[in-house]
Regions:
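Catalytic-loop of the protein kinase fold
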Residues: 182-199
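Protein kinase glycine-rich loop
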Residues: 54-60, 65
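Activation segment signature within eukaryotic-like protein kinase domains
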Residues: 170-171
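Activation-segment/catalytic-loop signature of the eukaryotic protein kinase fold
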Residues: 128
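AlphaC helix of the protein kinase catalytic domain
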Residues: 147-161
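AlphaC helix of the eukaryotic protein kinase fold
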Residues: 93-115
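Juxta-kinase regulatory segment immediately upstream of eukaryotic protein kinase catalytic domains
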Residues: 2-48, 52
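Conserved short submotifs of the Hanks-type protein kinase catalytic core
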Residues: 132-146
């Protein structure tokens, strides 16, 4: 009897893609693109109530990215700022100054991404808001592996070196991507080109 209940529950969980997801409400959502007044309500509904899968969370420099789905089942990436904790500081002023600095850097990252959104090779940006009082960016979810995770599969020796052909192809594709950045108005400098940020 108990075995049947466990089996039925397991089957139910396997079929329900929403099980194990955390509700992430994006407050103060600002769309990344200009929208007409008739388009705004649907856009807000699309990106302000998300279901985040914390099992997919990956941490970067000052943020963490989690795969989330909206009510329509569309996958998006929810990137949240990682704020410094209070216990790392002796005084409140130093802590608050660092929090302000982190928030400004995260907003600058959003604005830079906004300039590149829509260019081939860059994830589409949907908007900015806060989740639980923490700044957040909603963008296109890109399925795949980072170069940092894949490079061992492409290695030709124990030192992790790539074959000249693979290295040349990666270099060519990265160069092509960097050239597209010149299409942005006054130019653009990417400050975090690394294998962890290349998919």
């Amino acid at each position: 009897m108990m075995t049947d209940l466990v089996s039925a529950t397991s089957q139910s969980l396997a079929r329900d893609p929403m099980v194990g997801l955390r509700l992430a409400r994006v407050d103060g959502f600002e769309p990344a693109v200009a929208l007409g007044t008739d388009e705004l309500p649907a856009y807000l509904r699309r990106f302000t109530m998300l279901f985040a899968d914390d099992a997919t969370m990956r941490r970067g420099g000052i943020g963490r990215v989690t795969r989330a789905v909206n009510a329509q089942g569309e996958a998006v990436a929810l990137k949240q700022l990682i704020l410094p904790t209070r216990d790392e500081f002796d005084d409140d002023a130093a802590h608050e100054a660092l929090v302000t600095k982190f928030k400004a850097a995260f907003r600058e990252e959003y604005e830079c991404h906004r300039a590149l959104s829509g260019l081939k090779g860059f994830p589409r940006l949907y908007g900015w808001g806060e989740v639980g009082g923490v700044p957040a960016i909603v963008m296109e979810w890109v399925e795949g592996e980072t170069l940092a995770r894949l490079r061992s599969r492409f290695a030709v020796d124990d030192a992790g070196r790539l074959s000249p052909l693979v290295a040349a192809r990666l270099g060519r594709d990265l160069f092509d991507l960097l050239c597209r950045m010149s299409l942005v108005g006054e130019g653009f400098v990417h400050r975090d080109i690394s294998p962890a940020n290349i998919m």
